[in-house]
Amino acid sequence: QKISKVAPCGEFDGFSGDKVDTSGGTLLPGLIDCHVHLVYSGEADPKSRLLNLKPGQIVMSAFENAQKTLRSGVTSIRDLGGRDYLEFAVRDACNSGRQLGPTIKAAGRMICMTGGHGNVFGRIADGPDEVLKAVREQIHAGSDVIKLMATGGVMTPGVNPEDAHYTEEELRVGVD
């Protein structure tokens, strides 16, 4: 359900919706989480789990995560990388209202360098031409946002989070 009016009690003349007395409480707008991975479930090694699940199981888990997110007060999320675009099914169902969940903007496959952070499920792209092609592929697949793995990360064994993974030229091509 959506909030259709917020006003002092005396200003609801003629209003036909449900009225909720929030006296003594605090009303917050929906929260936004700008970095989630719906297909992950908080485990230390998401790669092993995802490699052992079938696509339908991954989608159902992502739906459950989306619904948990909404119940926690987060009404909009940005999913920054999933598995084989499976999170797009969750995004489309939630955004269309067919399923209960937050508003979702999804990146699709993370764009990463060979051997870099996210390379197991990401779209590997080395050099400016490959980065440009990878960005175009994500747009064609229906991505709302693009995620470029500019540095290493903590979830990929043997990768230093402080290391640069793309040159300035590669990043410019990916952003332009």
Predicted regions, residues:
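Divalent metal-coordination and catalytic microenvironments
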Residues: Q1, G24, I32-H35, G73, ...
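Histidine-rich, glycine-flanked metal-binding segment
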Residues: Q1-L28
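Short amphipathic alpha-helices and their capping/turn segments at secondary-structure boundaries
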Residues: S16-T26, E87-R98, P128-D144
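Metal-associated gating/positioning segment near the N- to mid-region
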Residues: G25-S96, E169, V173
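N-terminal small/glycine-rich loop or linker at the start of catalytic domains
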Residues: P29-K47, P102-R123, T151
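Active-site mouth loops of central-metabolism enzymes
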Residues: K47-M60, G116-A134, N160
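Divalent metal-dependent hydrolysis catalytic cores, especially in the metallo-beta-lactamase
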Residues: S61-E87, G101-C112, S143-T156
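Histidine/acidic residue-rich metal-binding segments in metalloenzymes
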Residues: A89, D129-D176
